[in-house]
UniProtKB/Swiss-Prot annotation:
InterPro entries to which the protein is assigned, alphabetical: Ribosome_maturation_RimP, RimP_C, RimP_C_sf, RimP_N, RimP_N_sf
Summary of the function given for this chain in its UniProt record: Required for maturation of 30S ribosomal subunits.
Protein name, UniProt field: Ribosome maturation factor RimP
Gene Ontology process terms (BP): ribosomal small subunit assembly; translation
Cytoplasm found in the keyword field: yes
Domain of life (superkingdom): Bacteria
Source species of the chain: Psychrobacter cryohalolentis (strain ATCC BAA-1226 / DSM 17306 / VKM B-2378 / K5)
A Pfam short name: DUF150_C
HAMAP family: RimP
Gene3D superfamilies in UniProt: Ribosome maturation factor RimP, C-terminal domain, RimP-like superfamily, N-terminal
Main location: cytoplasm
Disulphide connectivity of cysteines: none
CDD domains: YlxS_C
Family: Belongs to the RimP family.
Amino acid sequence: MKLSTKVTELTNIIAPAVAACDVALWGIEFAPQGNRSLLRIYIEALPEEQAQNKQVTIENCAAVNHQVSGILEVHDPISGEFILEVSSPGFDRAFFSDEQMHAYVGQTVSLRLIQAIGEGDKKRRKATGTLNSIDATSLKLTATDGEQFEIALSNIDKANLIYEDA
């Protein structure tokens, strides 16, 4: 889940504006698309508000959109036109850093890998299962078919939480 140089640059510019709106920055997606790019910002309630079961509201999204628009006008880090979207990460949230996954140990995650894992005809570049543990270099996953994997964090291209209605 290595962030591109552009996403890192945008994060450094945008993070203070998001914090000024009293919400937490979960992550940023940037997709250059010809003459018009897409910048998607995910925000969530601050930890102390999450403890009180407070969620991100449409008003939070609008405030961040307004604040970030102003910052981007000043810094102009995106060439050409762009679409700015602000939302919560949702139930099936993407993970933007390894650290974000720690809070979801015991839950189901979906991984897209850089290099395949497994043996023979059971090799796979995608794995879905229970996140058993995570440390500084790897995670342990029990796949939905029961197979156990230890996966290097450096081998993860994309990771998402899989929402399961309790």
